[in-house]
Amino acid sequence: DMVLLIGHQQDVEKDFTYDTSKVEAFLVPAGTAVEVYATTLHYAPCHVKETGFQCVVVLPKGTNTELTFDKEDKGEDRLLTAKNKWLIAHEEAAIEGAFNGLKGKNIQII
């Protein structure tokens, strides 16, 4: 089993911030297939048992590979971390180089 933390892209504000109170958690039982649409905000799957979990993620070819161009440090480019990968982080996560645009509680699955 695992939990997916999901949000809607249209809830991202014009300044690229996102209110974490809009996140919904979904329990995905083992053996279940899930499609996450391109307009879905999501975080890495979360384990619900100390033994962890295994999952398969299928992405378009080239996704998460190194950028082949110089991005600008403004607008949506601030969120781009790799090909087809945008990241809005929480300040508490202290992810080097990430755009800290998650506002509100830093959600944890306990």
Where do the model's predicted regions map?
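Active-site region of the double-stranded beta-helix
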Residues: 1-30, 44-52, 56-110
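Aromatic-residue-lined binding/catalytic grooves and analogous aromatic/hydrophobic interfacial grooves
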Residues: 36
